[in-house]
Design a protein with these regions (language model features):
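Short alpha-helix plus adjacent loop in nuclease-associated cores
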Residues: 116-133
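Beta-strand segments within the central parallel beta-sheet cores of soluble alpha/beta enzyme folds
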Residues: 114-118, 175-177
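Conserved catalytic/binding loops enriched for acidic/polar residues
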Residues: 153
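Acidic two-metal-ion nuclease catalytic site recognized across multiple nuclease folds
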Residues: 1, 158-177
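Conserved non-catalytic scaffold segment of RNase H-like nuclease domains
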Residues: 1-113, 128, 135-148
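Buried hydrophobic packing segments
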Residues: 100, 122, 157-161
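P-loop/Walker A phosphate-binding loop and immediately adjacent motor/lid segment at beta-alpha junctions
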Residues: 113-114, 170
Length: 177
């Protein structure tokens, strides 16, 4: 990875099992190996019924998001956050990529065409960690985490990429970055 590359770590929390139900998003922007910006927002999902399972995970309820902007409004208002970045990073990237794609589709917006780096795969490949849940990787690296708060999860993910690149600057090559 070129040291001057910029990326955004992203994390979603969802209201139910459907991928278009984002109710919170955290984004952490990194440029030249330093965190330069953070964004956290609550999002009003398309349905008011929250899965008890999801509420138990992240603690967000309809009453917390009923006055929040829907995804389309939030994403358009904050579109500039992704300007100049070369990739997105997420822990279990297939989940966050699918949430972003489903929310963009539902909102009639194009999904970003940036490659995703998965920090689960980084942790397995670089440090041979098992298990690779976010708290496990953070504990291994000595990182603070308020798990299932999208802002904290996104920052932890950004710091995992930073640690991986510091240890092996070529570790992102398998992701096409």
């Amino acid at each position: 990875m070129n040291c001057s590359q910029a990326y955004v770590a992203i994390d979603f929390e969802t209201a139910d099992s459907r991928r278009d139900s984002a109710c919170a998003v955290g984004l952490t922007k990194v440029r030249s190996g330093e965190i330069v910006d953070r964004l956290y927002g609550l999002i009003r999902p398309p349905r008011s019924r929250f899965s008890p399972f999801c509420v138990n995970v992240h603690g967000i309820r309809w009453s917390d998001v009923k006055d929040a902007p829907p995804f389309r409004e939030f994403w358009i208002e904050n579109a500039g956050f992704l300007e100049g970045v070369q990739f997105l990073a997420a822990h279990n990237a297939s989940f966050d990529r699918s949430v972003l794609g489903a929310c963009c589709t539902m909102a009639g917006l194009p999904a970003p065409s940036l490659p995703f780096v998965c920090t689960v795969d980084l942790a397995r490949n670089l440090w041979s960690l098992r298990p690779t849940k976010l708290p496990d990787v953070c504990r291994h690296l000595g990182l603070d985490l308020n798990h299932h708060h999208a802002g904290s999860d996104a920052e932890a993910c950004a710091r995992i990429v930073m640690a991986a690149v510091a240890e092996n600057p070529r570790c992102l090559a398998p992701f096409g970055v």
